[in-house]
Amino acid sequence: MGKETPAEKSLNLIRGRLCDPSYVFRPLSASSDSNYSKLKFIVSTSITEGCNNSMLLLGPRGSGKAAVLDLGVGDLLEQFPDSVSVIRLNGLLHSDDNCAFKEIAKQLCMEHHLLFSKMASFDDNSQFIIAMLRACGLAHKTIIFVLDEFDMFAQGKQRLLYSLLDAMQSVTSQAVVVGISSRLDADQLLEKRVRSRFSHRKFLFLPPSREELDGLFVHLLSLPADSGFPSGYVSRFNDKIKNLTSDTRFKDILKTLFNANSTVNSFLKFIFCAVSLMNLESGLLSLENFKAALSSMQRQPKLEAVRDCSVLELYLLVCMRRLEVKEQSSYNFISVMKEYKAIHDSFHTSDYYAQNVCLRAFEHLRERQVICYAENRGQSQTGEYRLQKLLISASELHQGMRSHACCPAILLKLLDH
Amino acid sequence: MASTPRAKTFKSPTKTPSNIYRKSYLSPSSTSHTPQTPETHTPLRRSARHVSRKIDLGNDPIDAPGNDPIEGMNLIRKRERAPRKPTTDVVPSKSKKTETPKKKKKIDSFTPVSPIRSETIKKTKKKKRVYYNKVEFDETEFEIGDDVYVKRREDSNSDEEEDPEIEDCQICFKSDTNIMIECDDCLGGFHLKCLKPPLKEVPEGDWICQFCEVKKSGQSQTLDLPKPPEGKKLARTMREKLLSGDLWAARIDKLWKEVDDGVYWIRARWYMIPEETVSGRQPHNLKRELYLTNDFADIEMECILRHCSVKCPKEFSKASNDGDDVFLCEYEYDVHWRSFKRLAELADGDSDSDQEWNGRKEEEVDDSDEEMELDDEVLKSKRGGLTSARGGANSRKGRFFGVEKVGMKLIPEHVRCHKQSELEKAKATLLLATRPKSLPCRSKEMEEITSFIKGSISDDQCLGRCMYIHGVPGTGKTISVLSVMKNLKAEVEEGSVSPYCFVEINGLKLASPENIYSVIYEALSGHRVGWKKALQCLNERFAEGKRIGKEDEKPCILLIDELDLLVTRNQSVLYNILDWPTKPNSKLVVLGIANTMDLPEKLLPRISSRMGIQRLCFGPYNHTQLQEIISTRLNGIDAFEKTAIEFASRKVAAISGDARRALEICRRAAEVADHRLNTNKSAKNQLVIMADVEAAIQEMFQAPHIQVMKSVSKLSKIFLTAMVHELYKTGMAETTFDRVATTVSSICLTNGEAFPGWDILLKIGCDLGECRIILCEPGEKHRLQKLQLNFPSDDVAFALKDNKDLPWLANYL
């Protein structure tokens, strides 16, 4: 083992950047109209002016809601180190009201070095939270409640939301309640009492534009000149990146990627795949790396399942399809075997197998989720008597069979008629 | 209300004062004699001093010759010396000079000498005490809650005779009837005419003398204060001694008299000057600022010198003619954790209603065992922090161990030094947490509630009754009831209404509906029990008429907010609560608040019949009322255009009539204006304009799904178009992924787009389902997955019709 090569160091550097949300979203938040500026302004207003606020961050998954909030809260923690404490809840973990109140009390105790008691009841915890809000308000401290997966808190009686928002309007406190949700109708889920107390500040996180993504691409992949890399390598690497961005084929690759998903998270995954495939000998990214990354991003698992079937499994799939064409919407293994026998008798195929071999092939198809049970009831029945459904469509089956290596020609003929 | 301190100089007795004090400490059983007037003074001199002091206490400017009172002076943190009558009484100067003691900044040495001795004495003997609310001592009245000067050491008595109430001018060293002005930096007093150049009027705002001004500008040349003439000693007022650490200030917490020896004691809560805290004097501290601590001590009343006046910031701003003994106290300092907290203003907090009815008693005999226990607790908390045996901070309701640890190590600078702009004042007053002084637009409803309650509890025949109050959220139901209860409490103190006890419960803050029994019982009796035991006790009280103490004879008013959450499967909770007022001698009045108008009709017949016919409806606010509500809050603050307020009022009145929503829109508009003015600092208009209100409304009522649909990926748009197309083709809202994929395939084939594949298309559909643009089953169903639009198809058509990248989408919509 020798010293780390510049290629490996650059690979680690770029991977570290891709996994750092603040590095990714800092340039996207530079504008004064951005959600980051608005968020930071509202929370800092709560800190400096001693008031309460509540807001809701909405956007598709992967658009940077939690990352931008962490960026803003991190900046405010640096600016006001003694005046801010953050309480984080997640709807997947704390959607139960008792659990949520206990978690808030626990985090408040940890933040202020108090002793937490697990035996406290719902009443004790809720009164404690109100007392802490009052004490922090008198001490000019702001508590930021981050409710991730906000729509999960909006189920049931919504006691947590009501208590937090009601405490913010009746107690002299400084608190900010931030809800984060990928459901765009999250505010419609609120009960009418909670909705009245919520301030309905909604910040929408939309995918960035092409220019912003191009700038982000260069920002993520350019090597800094003042680092420990050899200067010749840095200039070669950065020139390669610049040439890539102006290449027409690269633009087509990005266009295909963004046609399906244009969020930042998808873009980061794509770059991560490409960087992981970088040639460690030359230490440079090439167009082939991005092509391979696009292929891995655009996989079709159901199609690959059909392509990897055996010939007998293909026969069974064709038989199911023919049964559906005959308006027989539900079938089981016995019906499929009848159809298989009929095909054999009509066309005298040379590939005829016994029933137990066919049953094993049938179960193999179900394990790969090409077919599934039609209903969940009647589990006491044997496998061959339960109703089945074909999950792939006719065109998918057709496409898979055409790309199969050793598909008999008779099957294609059988599928068409 | 803080009154002008009644000042009186402590007169010297015939004997040596140190002898008397030493004697009283060594043998507390001996009776302390009232000090006598020294016989050496002539009657004429004593009479002249008495007359002079009487006039000075009045602060009457009419008696000042040749000085017209200045009308309409708006003084901020300015204390003008009232003109005083000249006195010919000259105090003879002492030949001995008292050494100035060193400042003691450590907390450990803060405890004064006197209280330690008194505590030691008190520990050894348990004595009977007579507690007072008011005591006259040395011809001065002292009351619980008063602020006083306290001696620091025994031998500080020698300075006592020299205490002038009137400060000398720092330039001519005379105190006369002319108006003086105080420097805000060195707190020195100056005659207006002694200044260079002389002032004709007291200027508004802050004022610094020329000596401090030169010092602050950092010039190498220092302008020295004039020195006093020879033979005249510069007299220090008590305020100066306190701020330099030679005296203490304290608040009287308790007053009592030992029965055996007749010695008067007080329980003192100490004040601290900023220099004595761990953080020292911080840059934003005012010269006259003190901190209230949580340090207590028992001292004899003879250690008290006289009154001073410690005020909260609002009263401090108005105190312009209150003399030299005025101080500011805004923060509380915890001597154990060395942290600061803002003092909770007493006007905000609601005091316990049970304590109010006790009223003020002249004297009360109390057992000293309880007092000793309290002292032990205080001493224990002085020595160390909390022990883990006490349990967690959140383990018991109403007693949170360690909450006092929550405090600032340093008071942040932006809180004290920041001057609020008009926009910030508007934002503060538009907060939902800000309580308005008056409640506009609900006078009729409040009168109805008042007459209902008064009719229920008047005289001695308390009728058990119920009232159901309903209305949509944000129409002022709860705040109206609380405002009525506050007014009634004031009337109880005046004596025109008989006392009652008031319990307020919120249905959404209970762990379960049955928990309401425990909460009611705890509020009435102070005991914590399970809900079954509580139900039994409440049944005994209300249904069977059993009463234990004298407190139970009072009527009980029960306010249940969010009443509809108490509905259980068999509705037994509501039945019990509404059945109790129908019993004779229950003396229970129930006020229920909920949002639904038809809640009684939904309940069981035997419950709705007990709820009675007393209904009160709070309708949604119309735009005139909303405008009045907002304008009342913004009274005196010039931050909004009138059209902006009207625009917000009309918008909210058209949608919901919710006062909370209207206030939030105006506050959000003020935030938008603040953000706009911060980024564009050259703007001349500082008001909230209509565009800001429009931006706030746009943000609050926006449809985010349309914006998201406009910005989704290309294939997502094609997917949505295919769904709309399927809807029109089949007429059914629900479709399957198989059909949508087939439609997408044909659309892509027709318009030259590459079909992505079924699996990628399935993922696109699941992503749209996660945003709830469409509703979909889990993706594992693949071809059989059921899909449905979550928003109207017109919204999809509106969002996708004008797309630039895909102009042909309009053909399918």
Swiss-Prot record, chain A:
It comes from Arabidopsis thaliana (Mouse-ear cress). Component of the origin recognition complex (ORC) composed of at least ORC1 (ORC1A or ORC1B), ORC2, ORC3, ORC4, ORC5 and ORC6. ORC is regulated in a cell-cycle and development dependent manner. It is sequentially assembled at the exit from anaphase of mitosis and disassembled as cells enter S phase. Interacts directly with ORC1A, ORC2, ORC3, ORC5 and ORC6. The keyword Glycoprotein does not apply. One of its GO terms (molecular function) is ATP hydrolysis activity. Belongs to the ORC4 family. Follow a cell-cycle regulation with a peak at the G1/S-phase. Isoform AtORC4a is expressed at low levels ubiquitously. Isoform AtORC4b is mostly expressed in siliques, flowers and flower buds, and, to a lower exent, in roots, leaves and stems. SUPFAM superfamilies: P-loop containing nucleoside triphosphate hydrolases. GO terms for biological process: DNA replication initiation. This is Origin of replication complex subunit 4. Induction: Regulated by E2F. Accumulates rapidly after cell cycle reactivation by sucrose addition following cell cycle arrest mediated by sucrose deprivation. GO terms for cellular component: nuclear origin of replication recognition complex. It is found in: Nucleus. Pfam families: AAA (PF00004), ORC4_C (PF14629). ATP binds at G59, P60, R61, G62, S63, G64, K65, A66. Component of the origin recognition complex (ORC) that binds origins of replication. DNA-binding is ATP-dependent. The specific DNA sequences that define origins of replication have not been identified yet. ORC is required to assemble the pre-replication complex necessary to initiate DNA replication. Keywords: ATP-binding, DNA replication, DNA-binding, Nucleotide-binding, Nucleus. The lineage of its organism: Eukaryota, Viridiplantae, Streptophyta, Embryophyta, Tracheophyta. It comes from the Eukaryota.
Swiss-Prot record, chain B:
Its main location: nucleus. Changing F190A: In ORC1b-PHD(F/A); reduced H3K4me3 interaction. It comes from the Eukaryota. Residues 1-109, 349-372 are annotated as: Disordered. Zn(2+) 2 binds at C169, C172, H191, C194. A motif (Nuclear localization signal) lies at residues 83-90. GO terms for cellular component: nucleus; origin recognition complex. Mg(2+) binds at D561, E562. This is Origin of replication complex subunit 1B. It comes from Arabidopsis thaliana. The gene is ORC1B.
